[in-house]
Amino acid sequence: VITRGALLERTGLPRPYATSRPLRIAALELAPPGPQEMLVRVLAAGLCHSDLSVIDGSRPRPMPMVLGHEAAGTVEHVGADVGGFAPGDLVVFAFVPSCGACLPCAEGRPALCEPGAA
């Protein structure tokens, strides 16, 4: 699956970002969705303050990184183990990286991931 995203390759570029242009729209290849995943065609996405804190380096993250973690779109594919959704459904979502190892992740609450939320 080929898509496009706002790609950040390095942090700490000077402001104003309209001049230093830390982001570029890049073609990205995604692995096919697994049995517990969905593929969503993003129709609208936003960049917010948490994304700016990644750009300026105050919230360290592995690079390169695609920014924007709040979006709305249309479900294109639903994995075999996903219930309650069908292709064509309109959805909104917030993505927060999760480590899979901290207490909230172990309790099935990855949106509260301690390293991901830091």
PLM feature spans:
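Short structural boundary motif marking the start of a folded domain
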Residues: 1-6
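Glycine-rich beta-strand-centered segment in the early N-terminal region that forms part
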Residues: 30-45, 55-106, 111
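Conserved Rossmann-like nucleotide-cofactor binding loop
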Residues: 48
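Short cysteine/histidine-rich zinc-coordinating motifs and their immediately flanking basic loops
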Residues: 111-118
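Short polar catalytic/cofactor-binding loops
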Residues: 8-14, 45
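Short glycine/threonine/proline-enriched tight-turn/helix- or strand-capping micro-motif at secondary-structure
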Residues: 19-29
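Acidic Ser/Thr/Pro-rich low-complexity disordered segments
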Residues: 12-20, 118
